[in-house]
């Protein structure tokens, strides 16, 4: 055999090896990381995920510690007799059964269509091509993670830390949370990956090769083991982790930053504040009571509530042609420039009202609401310019307030990983005009408009890290 033929044969064998590495049945893969692998190094109790038994009870148990609410199923307070409790349970039983049946049939297919086996089979060639591209072009490393509920999570890691010219973005890891019909093989990770960041993609339980059924509690368990894998096996410091959630992925993204507040940043793309308004939009009006109950008990994607629990930098990407997360109209095409019904608007208002309640009182909320109605980048810029916002003055005011808080809280735990804890009472004593200008400044720093539809791939230059004061 000549030298050239030998080289060709060697290249062919190498390609066969690479192909086998990602087409080999996932169930036969060795486990790379388990949720309890970090117990030996003293895992913090505040990062407790759901146990297998607790997973069946829902994500509420997990939210109880962080949000400070009452856990679902906690015995009612007061002196109610056992007979009254039993009677109440019997009255609610038909509704609970109907809600359970809807959630485990049509509901799950509507909320997580990517888990339908027929869709997975139809997309299998594209998924294999996507894996091939990530492995061969970006040297992706596939790994199997096991969550606390026993689900096996399929992940792909692209390490850009040693990539030439990646000294700016490469040291940061972007954990990508896909939508309800997204897979890491062909999902939202392409934008941060092409922008030069290290990227960790994963599939929801029941999506692709990941096992299990996609319910919020199982999604939270999967996200928990993914974050632990990034911290303890891939060895990225918490401050270098950026969580990026697209669409329904905003739930797991906000859950991660709520549970791990020391993570570096959060980017939410084309997501919403709450699932109930969107569910009511597509379901019959006569089903309203059943739909609300089903969502609250089985698909409580409370993105806004979880978002307000994260103290770090946040950027919201609102797509101006997005008809999926919009409640404008009912099952009709979205008219150009109609962004008033986009649920990302409520997400921004909830965030700003939590962080800056004085600024967002009355005049502040009103002016931000009008600014959010701008249907194009030109209209947005014109509205902003009309109020003559002095950005230097806004920055100086915010930095001065933060410095005073840091002096008062020096050495105390209240300072937190991102500085003084929210809410900030900055803006007291300001005139109405100045509060409006400060509110507009903060809104523009936390939300960026992208002229695209819900399913359009995000351009690499559109993916940016959030603003830091």
Swiss-Prot record:
Its EC number is 3.1.1.111. One of its GO terms (molecular function) is monoacylglycerol lipase activity. GO terms for cellular component: nucleoplasm. The active site is at residues 247, 322, 418. GO terms for biological process: monoacylglycerol catabolic process; phosphatidylserine catabolic process. Residues 174-298 form the AB hydrolase-1 domain. Keywords: Hydrolase, Lipid metabolism, Phospholipid metabolism. It holds the Pfam family Abhydrolase_1. Signal peptide: none annotated. Gene3D superfamilies: alpha/beta hydrolase (3.40.50.1820). SUPFAM superfamilies: alpha/beta-Hydrolases. It catalyses: a 1,2-diacyl-sn-glycero-3-phospho-L-serine + H2O = a 2-acyl-sn-glycero-3-phospho-L-serine + a fatty acid + H(+); a 1-acylglycerol + H2O = glycerol + a fatty acid + H(+); 1-(9Z-octadecenoyl)-glycerol + H2O = glycerol + (9Z)-octadecenoate + H(+). Belongs to the AB hydrolase superfamily. ABHD16 family. Hydrolyzes the sn-1 position of glycerophospholipids with high specificity towards phosphatidylserine (PS), PS-PLA1 enzyme. Also hydrolyzes the acyl chain of glycerolipids with a preference for the monoacylglycerol (MAG) 1-acylglycerol, MAG lipase. Plays a regulatory role in cellular lipid homeostasis by modulating genes involved in neutral lipid degradation and in phospholipid synthesis and composition. This is ABHD16B. The gene is ABHD16B.
């Amino acid at each position: 055999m000549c030298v050239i033929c030998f080289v060709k044969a060697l290249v062919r064998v190498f390609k066969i090896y690479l192909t086998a590495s990602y087409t080999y049945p996932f169930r036969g893969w060795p486990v790379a990381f388990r949720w309890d692998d970090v117990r030996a190094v003293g895992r913090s109790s505040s990062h407790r995920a759901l146990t297998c038994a607790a997973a069946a009870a829902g994500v509420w148990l997990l939210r109880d510690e962080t949000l400070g609410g009452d856990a679902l199923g906690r015995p009612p307070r007061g002196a109610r007799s056992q007979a009254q409790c039993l009677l109440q349970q019997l009255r609610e039983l038909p509704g609970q059964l109907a809600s359970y049946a809807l959630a485990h049939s049509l509901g799950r297919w509507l909320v997580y269509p990517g888990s339908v086996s027929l869709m997975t089979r139809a997309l299998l060639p594209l998924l294999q091509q996507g894996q091939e591209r990530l492995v061969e072009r970006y040297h992706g490393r596939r790994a199997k993670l096991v969550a606390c509920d026993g689900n096996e999570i399929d992940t792909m890691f692209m390490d850009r830390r040693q990539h030439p010219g990646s000294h700016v973005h490469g040291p940061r890891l972007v954990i990508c949370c896909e939508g309800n019909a997204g897979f890491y093989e062909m999902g939202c990770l392409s934008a941060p990956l092409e922008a030069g960041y290290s990227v960790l993609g994963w599939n929801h339980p029941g999506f692709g090769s990941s096992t299990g059924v996609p319910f919020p509690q199982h999604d939270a368990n999967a996200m928990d083991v993914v974050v632990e894998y990034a911290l303890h096996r891939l060895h990225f410091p918490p401050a270098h982790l950026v969580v990026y959630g697209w669409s329904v992925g905003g739930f797991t993204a906000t859950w991660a930053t709520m549970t791990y507040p020391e993570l570096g940043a959060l980017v939410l793309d084309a997501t919403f504040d709450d699932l109930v308004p969107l569910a009511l939009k597509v379901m019959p009006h006569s089903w309203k009571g059943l739909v609300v109950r089903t969502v609250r008990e089985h698909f409580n994607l409370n993105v806004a509530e979880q978002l307000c629990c994260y103290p770090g930098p946040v950027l919201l990407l609102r797509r101006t042609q997005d008809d999926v997360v919009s409640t404008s109209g009912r099952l009709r095409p979205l008219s150009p420039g109609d962004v008033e019904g986009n649920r990302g608007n409520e997400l921004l208002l909830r965030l700003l009202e939590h962080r800056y309640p004085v600024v967002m009182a009355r005049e502040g909320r009103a002016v931000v609401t009008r600014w959010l109605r701008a249907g194009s980048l030109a209209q947005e810029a014109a509205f902003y310019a009309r109020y003559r916002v002095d950005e230097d003055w806004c920055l100086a005011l915010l930095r001065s307030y933060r410095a005073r808080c840091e002096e008062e809280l020096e050495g105390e735990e209240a300072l937190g990983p991102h500085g003084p804890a929210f809410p900030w009472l900055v803006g007291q004593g300001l005139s109405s005009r100045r509060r409006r200008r400060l509110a507009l400044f903060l809104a523009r720093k936390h939300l960026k408009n992208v002229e695209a539809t819900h399913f359009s791939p995000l351009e690499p230059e559109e993916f940016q890290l959030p603003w830091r004061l």
